């Protein structure tokens, strides 16, 4: 009996140690790893293609994969330059614990659905299986759209946990051009997929104010209600805004603008805190906003605003920016680019105005111009050039060309030309508003 007990104990010990031995062998053998990868199915259900190229190393000691290509009925993924290491012991309790996971390039692109859509929510992993991804880093992640420019994120880091019906993303950080991003969220297996997330975006340059936006959401990818908005350098609170995160994506809603103070940008305090409401309509073809803003300093009622543009690779491109004041018939049309650089926003704008008068309201007109052209270019100190037909009070019409520099707290102009009657005047000078209003002008007049 004693001998049988010993034999039974040895057999039990061998049975219990067999998984550990097999796991140890798999974890430290490159040949075993390649064999397991070769046995993976290349197609399964909605997975149309799985391709894994050039696997080297071991699970426990660290391994590399040259490329993984995944083609799903809705999305295409290509992952290049993979490096990772697995902790072996957690595999015994059905946990895949990945550490030091790094990807050189990740590309995601939508694909037209070629299979019937699922009727029930599919789990992310088999029941009781857990995947832990620690110290995850993606050097470059590109999201391509069916239309429009791709979105490229750099140096993305995060911690993640995947279970049967939940994916947790913690402490995600990265950059979109010069915009720093932070996010936390939970993706939920549902029809459609559910998402609970918090995100923050920050742009800080050497010149100019800091830009900060925060957004929270809790919904599904068909309809994600958005709360939050822009916090600095002015406030733009989202109102009744929602995002469709599935292709074709779109964002609809409104932004309630307040505390827009030009002194934050080096401008004059004359305009006061500008406020108003803009209707938002964003999608892959562009970003559109329409509404009205009001300046207490102008005291002229609302000014209609219309914007249509795109954003890609650090550059906001204004196809058109229109400002209109119905009572005075003033209209300003602008187009060009704003590029977010380390030194500050770089402007390259041009436009025209019609029916400008000052003041905007009232019977007495000190200055008026039926039409004119302008350009605004530079970083920090912005070069301005205007060409216009100008009338001051009751004086005859004059032709003007003004070249100047808009700097924090002042406007400096040099050799600006005024053609009046049969003579020409050349003026240089400075108009300042910080800390106090000041001005000086020098010039000469010639026949």
Where are these regions (language model features)?
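Amphipathic hydrophobic-ligand
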Residues: 73-86, 114-116, 147-159, 175-184, ...
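N-terminal type II signal-anchor transmembrane helix
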Residues: 1-46, 75
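Solvent-exposed beta-strand/coil patches in large extracellular/periplasmic or lumenal scaffold regions
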Residues: 51, 68, 118-172, 225-227, ...
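Structural motif
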Residues: 59-60, 163, 220, 281-283, ...
């Amino acid at each position: 009996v004693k001998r049988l007990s010993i034999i039974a104990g040895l057999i039990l010990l061998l049975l219990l140690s067999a998984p550990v031995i097999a796991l140890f062998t798999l974890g430290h053998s490159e040949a075993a790893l390649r064999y397991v990868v070769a046995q993976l199915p290349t197609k399964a259900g909605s997975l149309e293609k799985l391709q894994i190229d050039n696997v080297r190393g071991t699970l426990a000691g660290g391994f590399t994969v040259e490329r993984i290509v995944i083609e799903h009925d809705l999305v295409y993924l290509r992952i290049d330059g993979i490096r990772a290491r697995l902790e072996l012991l957690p595999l015994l309790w059905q946990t895949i614990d990945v550490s030091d996971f790094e990807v050189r390039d990740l590309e995601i692109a939508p694909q037209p659905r070629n299979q019937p859509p699922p009727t029930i929510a599919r789990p992310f992993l088999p029941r009781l299986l857990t995947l832990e991804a620690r110290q995850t880093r993606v050097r470059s992640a590109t999201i391509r759209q069916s239309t429009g420019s791709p979105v490229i994120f750099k140096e993305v880091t995060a911690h993640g946990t995947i279970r049967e019906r939940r994916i947790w993303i913690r402490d995600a950080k990265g950059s979109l051009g010069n915009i720093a991003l932070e996010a936390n969220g939970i993706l939920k297996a549902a029809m459609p997929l559910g998402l609970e997330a918090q995100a923050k975006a920050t742009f800080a340059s050497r010149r100019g104010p800091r830009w900060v936006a925060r957004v929270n959401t809790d919904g599904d990818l068909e309809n994600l209600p958005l709360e939050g908005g822009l916090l600095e350098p002015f406030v733009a609170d989202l109102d009744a805004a929602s995002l469709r995160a599935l292709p074709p994506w779109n964002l609809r809603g409104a932004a309630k603008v307040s505390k827009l103070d030009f002194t934050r940008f080096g401008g004059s305090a004359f305009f006061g805190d500008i406020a108003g409401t803009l209707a938002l309509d964003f999608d892959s073809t562009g970003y559109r906003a329409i509404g009205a803003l009001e300046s207490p300093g102008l005291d002229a009622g609302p000014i209609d605003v219309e914007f249509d543009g795109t954003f890609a690779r650090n550059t906001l491109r204004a196809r058109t920016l229109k400002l209109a004041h119905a009572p005075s018939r003033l209209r300003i049309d602008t187009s060009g680019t704003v590029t977010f650089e380390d030194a500050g926003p770089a402007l390259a704008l041009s436009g025209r105005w019609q029916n400008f008068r000052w003041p905007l309201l009232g019977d007495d007109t000190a200055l008026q111009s039926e039409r004119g052209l302008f350009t605004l270019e530079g970083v920090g100190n912005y070069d301005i050039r205007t060409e216009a037909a100008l009338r001051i009070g009751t004086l005859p019409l004059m032709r003007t060309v003004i070249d100047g520099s808009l700097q924090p707290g002042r406007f400096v102009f040099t050799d600006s030309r005024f053609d009046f009657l049969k003579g020409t005047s050349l003026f240089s000078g400075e108009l300042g508003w910080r800390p106090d209003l000041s001005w000086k002008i020098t010039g000469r007049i010639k026949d």
